[in-house]
Amino acid sequence: MPAFMPRPHPSFPALHLACLCLLATPAALASAQLPSHRLDNDVVESRVSEVAGGRLLSFALKGKPNFLLIDEAAGDPAVAPDATSGYIRYQGHEVWIGPQREWWVHQDLNPARAAAKATWPPDPWLSLAKYALVEKKQGELVLDSPASPVSGIQLRKRYALVTGKPDSLRLEAEATNRSGKLAGRDIWFNTRVPAHTMAYMPVASQEDLRIEPSGALRYTLGGGLLSLDLPMPGDAPRKGKLFAQPSHGWLAAFRDGQALVIQFAHQPRAAIHPAQGQVELYQDAVADAPGKGMLELEVHAPYVELAPGAAMRASELWTIMPYTGPATRDAHLDFLRRHAAQLGISIP
């Protein structure tokens, strides 16, 4: 696999009128079980927690509902993770380390999971531990994970509002190999949204797709653009994952008056671990229970052989916009085409 690009250390200029503050009012604590910091520039607002894996808890246009699926009461963040920890479904946005089939094979703290080549749960030290607050300033937050004895990785996460793009948030992840030995890994962004969210991405052909389990999901592919179909009343529940090699570096999601566009560095297929896709959509949806299940919008960075102490970086740029049109594929794609130049995305 090709090596990843050297890691730069960009700084984010302070965004005028942006504020970063710890939510500590009684009203805030009543509505948010996890302690959090807020990034707010009067156009968008988001909340990030040091606990529960340095997780992004919310992102939305100012005054609009949270676009993310979140359950802040899912677990007790004061409980330190260990090698027997299960997964706690806080949801929101988090960063995993791939490939999934190697999650537990490089450690000896839990021999049973190593022997089984367990593919669940993800690394507890990266997903559940409290991160250290490295820096906070106007419009920016930097957090460090502990060094994980499971994956051998330490994560640094940076969340920052974007100068000149008041409707955008940049998410950066830096993964450093602390294992003391060569480690093949990738950075894996995972964003959870409610199950009835409609998702789109550019895909050239069906040869760039696979679904696991086979036949579990339905999609529409036309004109170089893929949409994941939602189950209709009377349809069987949908539960599975679509793996894709996108033709360009973006995906989009629409729900309840907001459109979220996630941009990332497009990679050749050879750069992505063969067990993964650069974009993966995990759907768990039941037509008659739209409040249940979820959709995961997942993006993989290149698979890299990291020397001890070496690091790799990846990022996503999130832009959220108001959307007042019909909840249909044609209307959504027309909206994306009309805003493509503004967003800086390529649409087939």
Language-model features: locations:
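Bacterial N-terminal signal peptides
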Residues: 14-27
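Secreted/extracellular small peptides and ectodomain modules produced from precursors
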Residues: 10, 17-19, 88, 217
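N-terminal secretory signal peptides that target proteins for export/translocation
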Residues: 1-12
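Positively charged, low-complexity intrinsically disordered regions
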Residues: 8-10, 17, 102, 114
